[in-house]
Amino acid sequence: MKRFTLVVAAVFAVTRSFGAVSCEKYDDGRPDKSVRNEFNKMYPDAKDVEWDAEAGYWKVSFEKGNQPNRIDHEAWYAEDGTWVRTVSEYPVAKVPQGIKDLLSGSQYGELPLEDREVEYFETSSYGKFYRFDLWQNGREIKIDVHESGEVLPASYDVM
């Protein structure tokens, strides 16, 4: 009986350790080592990592955190490993109140939200901002609320 208990404990420990290991998938080949190194430096605790080549960039989808607080992210890198942007999906409830106040005090403040998720952009060229999907006259519009206080229609590509 003692041996059986030890075997069960060992199997449990091994399977738990596999669950904590981050697996990587490469759908479009494998990015250069400089790209992978930059990603690993920026996001050492990333889980469920998937790489894709898209529009001349490497896009890596990953998760951070544990349930129920796990957050989905996408980081984009140039071919040389230069970080371009990271987009994270947060529940509206997790958006800082100051950002929500900026949106509600703007001309878009009365428009209903399209869904309960908000994208948070960190970019190398446009700074940091939250992107809200809102409904206006039966169609979806995207509004960016910058941490600097600007509230603007999302009219530019963030690459």
Task: Please report, for each region that a protein language model flagged, where it lies by residue.
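Post-signal peptide N-terminal segment of mature Sec-exported envelope proteins
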Residues: 31-50
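A cross-family detector of function-defining hotspots
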Residues: 47-66, 112-131
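Long, charged/polar, surface-exposed segments that mediate recognition or autoinhibition
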Residues: 79-114
